[in-house]
Amino acid sequence: HTPHNPPTELFDKYIKLAPNEAVAKYWAMCEWFDKTVGDLMNYLKKNSLEENTLIVYTADNGWIQSNKQNRYAPRSKRAPHEGGIRTPIMFKLPKVIEPEMNTSTLVSNIDLVPTVLDFLNITGEKLSGISIMEKDKLNARETLFVECYHHDILNIEHPTETVLYKVALNKKWKLMLPNTKMVVREFTLPDEQYY
């Protein structure tokens, strides 16, 4: 997230490689994030907490750094395209979660709470999401719904006033319903570019 203000030594490393200062700062921020996650993991291991700590990582939106401006590129943040809505969701718990990279199962941040409750062996009330541990239920999910908002909710009583897009997607198709000033567009997912 902005502001991109990495340590000087990381910025100096990437300014020689990047097309411009904004991209160098973004790349340096990525490495800085990796380092701080590594520091956390080392702390947990050093203090014998690693095997009893559930690590969860996710993001609220995608971000593709623009090569031309100090901001996100089109078709990423606040956009219904893959670069804007396809974000990582990662869980780590040694001896419980097997490492896996899965880019085809329909999973969303609404699945975070059911998953954490599942790990804690807590039966929650009916929730919208599905625990990632319930693979059969996840695989049976046919459609995922997404909303892309303007940066701020301007009217808390009517948050849908700032919805830019509503999206329904399955493993093959994505339907993007923009606000009334734009047209409805449909894509075949494998053909859509990430940026």
Where are these regions (language model features)?
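A hydrophobic, helix-centered structural microdomain
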Residues: 1-19
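Acidic active-site catalytic centers that drive phospho-/nucleotidyl reactions
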Residues: 34, 52, 60, 111, ...
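C-terminal cap/loop subdomain of S1 sulfatases and analogous C-terminal strand-loop tails that border
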Residues: 63-69, 98, 105, 110-113, ...
